[in-house]
Curated annotation (Swiss-Prot):
UniProt keyword Cytoplasm present: no
N-terminal arm, as annotated region: 2-16
Originating species: Homo sapiens (Human)
Location of the region described as Connecting peptide in the Swiss-Prot/TrEMBL record: 102-106
Clinical note on disease: Cataract 3, multiple types: An opacification of the crystalline lens of the eye that frequently results in visual impairment or blindness. Opacities vary in morphology, are often confined to a portion of the lens, and may be static or progressive. CTRCT3 includes congenital cerulean and sutural cataract with punctate and cerulean opacities, among others. Cerulean cataract is characterized by peripheral bluish and white opacifications organized in concentric layers with occasional central lesions arranged radially.
PANTHER family: BETA-CRYSTALLIN B2, BETA/GAMMA CRYSTALLIN
Protein name per the record: Beta-crystallin B2
Limits of the Beta/gamma crystallin 'Greek key' domain: 17-56, 57-101, 107-148, 149-191
Tree of life domain: Eukaryota
């Protein structure tokens, strides 16, 4: 796991995180509300996640229990079917969840071609990048240093494919952030609306 994921002193986390899991699609059937980490969804009485409603987030879900397997980032909003939270469409399994800490208004990430922060690199500050190739970076991504903010990387351009949550800290190898291959081709910031409630956040039209 990456190091230094603690929230900075004095920086607020998500205020009262809240997510509701429904067994059926379109928010039907038995449901269960979560306000904190859930290592095994089945232990809450929910056999299968058919739809998800995030009332306060963000959250990260995992394919397997105990936060293992493919990752799914949930931000505030409605997810009526499993394919609305996965862009890889590889699995409809959602077995564990935890709130994501958002501890900074600033966002800075450095992506490296080789493990241990070597080789060609690309630095991104306060921006979302839908295609690394369009920015002239065509190398693999084998290690990552997140200096501030919380990010999600994607296997393919356009925020598609497998998702990788990148919290503040160092990831010496792609396996440290859960990637089966050193392939990340787009990245975006995760921004907690509650953090920006004083007007620092301006959604783009």
């Amino acid at each position: 796991m990456a190091s230094d994921h603690q929230t900075q002193a004095g920086k607020p986390q998500s205020l009262n995180p809240k997510i509701i899991i429904f067994e059926q699609e379109n928010f039907q059937g038995h449901s269960h509300e979560l306000n904190g980490p859930c290592p095994n969804l089945k232990e809450t009485g929910v056999e299968k996640a058919g739809s998800v409603l995030v009332q306060a987030g963000p959250w990260v879900g995992y394919e397997q229990a105990n936060c293992k397997g493919e990752q799914f980032v949930f931000e505030k909003g409605e997810y009526p079917r499993w394919d609305s939270w996965t862009s890889s469409r590889r699995t409809d399994s959602l077995s564990s969840l935890r709130p994501i800490k958002v501890d900074s208004q600033e966002h800075k990430i450095i992506l490296y071609e080789n493990p241990n922060f070597t080789g060609k690199k690309m630095e991104i500050i306060d921006d979302d990048v839908p295609s690394f190739h369009a920015h002239g970076y065509q190398e693999k991504v084998s290690s990552v240093r997140v200096q501030s903010g919380t990010w999600v990387g994607y296997q393919y351009p356009g925020y598609r494919g497998l998702q990788y949550l990148l919290e503040k800290g160092d990831y010496k190898d792609s396996s440290d952030f859960g990637a089966p291959h050193p392939q990340v081709q787009s990245v975006r910031r995760i921004r907690d609306m509650q953090w920006h409630q004083r007007g620092a956040f301006h959604p783009s039209n």
